């Protein structure tokens, strides 16, 4: 059911059946460290490159979510996944062995929400019993992609924000759980004229709520 300017309310709500999280060492040392399913001892995750490490995180997150739900990959109708790298290479390489039909997404820091929204819409519309949504980012690969490779030893201001090293996977389905997804609201592109590439927080946490999202 269409609601307001940019929202959908599901007549039959899907549920978040299971989830899993995999993070790097720095994230594990933070206040939420005890809540993650897997915390790496080092940010390469046993791989040779940051990009391979990000793929490994996605694979582990998906396998953990499936394992917690006692499901095989064949139980998933579609996978919605993305990352911060060109051509979604971390996702493509990370989920290859699962052999689940995949929609590759790229929404930068909104990819997790985008994947969950599309997975929920697909379940609510009856296109499958279960969907898998997954996303990831890696500080090392993101710095290399968008700012300065770590080997360049660029000095960062103390106020600079860090891209998280982590991956989250979510199984969305029809089985009842303690988390129900009743609808989605889709955002728009808004340019606030921000120029500081180190200040990601302003980009992530601003919204046009006052103008557009009241009564969505």
What are these regions (language model features)?
Residues 5-10, 72, 94-97, 111, ...:
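Solvent-exposed alpha-helices and their adjacent loops that cap or buttress functional pockets
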Residues 16, 50-110, 207:
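Conserved beta-ketoacyl condensing-enzyme motif
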Residues 205, 212-216:
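Single conserved hydrophobic/aromatic residue that forms the stacking wall/gate
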Residues 106-133, 172:
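Active-site-proximal alpha-helical scaffold in enzymes
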Residues 32-35, 91-101, 123-124, 146-155:
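A glycine- and small-aliphatic-rich helix-loop capping segment at beta-alpha/alpha-beta transitions
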Residues 87-89, 139-144, 188-193:
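Short, well-ordered, mixed-charge alpha-helical segments that flank or form enzyme active sites
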Residues 1-51, 147-204, 208:
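Condensing-enzyme catalytic core mediating Claisen C-C bond formation in acyl metabolism
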Residues 81-82, 131-137:
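Short beta-strand segments
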């Amino acid at each position: 059911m269409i609601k307001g300017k940019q929202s959908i309310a599901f007549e039959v709500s899907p549920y978040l059946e299971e989830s899993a999280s995999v993070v790097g060492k720095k994230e594990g040392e933070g206040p939420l460290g005890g809540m993650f399913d897997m915390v790496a001892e080092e940010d390469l995750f046993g791989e040779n490159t940051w990009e391979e490490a990000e793929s490994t995180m996605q694979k582990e997150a998906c396998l953990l979510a499936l394992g917690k739900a006692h499901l095989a990959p064949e139980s998933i109708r579609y996978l919605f996944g993305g990352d911060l790298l060109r051509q979604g290479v971390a996702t493509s390489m990370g989920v290859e062995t699962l052999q689940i039909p995949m929609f590759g997404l790229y929404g930068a820091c909104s990819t997790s929400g985008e994947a969950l929204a599309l997975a929920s819409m697909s379940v609510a519309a009856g296109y499958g019993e279960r969907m898998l949504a997954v996303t990831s980012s890696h500080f090392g690969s993101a710095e290399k992609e968008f700012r300065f490779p770590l080997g360049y030893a660029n000095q960062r201001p103390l106020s600079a924000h860090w891209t998280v090293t982590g991956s989250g996977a979510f199984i969305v389905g029809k089985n009842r759980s303690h988390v129900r997804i009743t609808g989605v609201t889709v955002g728009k592109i808004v340019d606030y004229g921000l120029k500081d590439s180190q200040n990601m927080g302003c980009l992530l946490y601003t919204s046009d709520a006052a103008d557009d999202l009241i009564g969505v």
